[in-house]
Amino acid sequence: MKFWLQGCAFVGCLLLTLPCCAARRRASGENLQQTRPIAAANLQWESYAEALEHSKQDHKPICLFFTGSDWCMWCIKMQDQILQSSEFKHFAGVHLHMVEVDFPQKNHQPEEQRQKNQELKAQYKVTGFPELVFIDAEGKQLARMGFEPGGGAAYVSKVKSALKLR
């Protein structure tokens, strides 16, 4: 009888703490949403040919984003933590032409696009993902970077330094 009462008391205590844990979890989730910055406009992706043409006109560098969008964990982190940050989107909108060079495993990609992406991967000697390769309008490499933790603002600072931008 003594053990039965102790067991009931223990289970009762556990049941009483569940609402507190759930409320704490909800509150922390709400706080995360409230502190997340409002996203800037989406990145403007261009084809490689379009980016070269536009870069010849406005002299902005081209950023080739080599990614495995549906299987590469670090590519997905880079997309979420850096490329989709308001700081990076603003910077890219002002200073870059963005080209996604994707190597999906699950999602369908037209054969022509797959071949073009393979050519770009070979041309710029990309051996791992994710990788950003910055080029000029002539296709000359200016800089290259992979994923780095720290978020969009820190990454933009490193890109500016690598490209010698203010």
UniProtKB/Swiss-Prot annotation:
Q: What broad class describes the main subcellular location of this protein?
A: periplasm
Where found?
Periplasm
The residue ranges of the Thioredoxin domain are: 32-166
Entry binding sites for substrate? M73, W74
Q: Which cysteines are joined by disulfide bonds?
A: C72-C75
| Molecular function terms, GO-annotated | oxidoreductase activity
* Pfam families (alphabetical): Thioredoxin_2
Q: What is its EC number?
A: 1.8.-.-
- Return the InterPro entries for the record: AGR/TXD, DsbH, Thioredoxin-like_fold, Thioredoxin-like_sf, Thioredoxin_domain
Q: Which UniProt keywords apply?
A: Disulfide bond, Oxidoreductase, Periplasm, Redox-active center, Signal
GO CC annotation terms, alphabetical:
periplasmic space
Tell me the first and last residues of the signal peptide. 1-22
Q: What class of enzyme is it?
A: oxidoreductase
Q: How does it assemble?
A: Monomer.
Q: What does this protein do?
A: Catalyzes the reduction of disulfide bonds. May function in reducing intermolecular disulfides between proteins and small molecules in the periplasm, or keeping a specific subset of periplasmic proteins reduced, or maintaining the periplasm of Chlamydia in a generally reducing state. Seems to be unable to oxidize thiols into disulfides and does not display disulfide bond isomerase activity.
NCBIfam families membership: DisulfRedDsbH
Q: What is this protein called?
A: Disulfide bond reductase DsbH
